[in-house]
């Protein structure tokens, strides 16, 4: 999920 990528704070 894109939300998982959002965890990186990008």
Curated annotation (Swiss-Prot):
Calcium-dependent lectin involved in innate immune defense. Binds mannose residues on the surface of the Gram-negative bacterium A.salmonicida. Shows agglutinating activity towards horse erythrocytes. GO terms for biological process: innate immune response; positive regulation of erythrocyte aggregation. GO terms for molecular function: D-mannose binding. This is C-type lectin 65 kDa subunit. Coiled coil: none annotated. It is found in: Secreted. One of its GO terms (cellular component) is extracellular region. It comes from the Eukaryota. Forms an oligomeric complex with the C-type lectin 35 kDa subunit. Keywords: Calcium, Hemagglutinin, Immunity, Innate immunity, Lectin, Mannose-binding, Secreted.
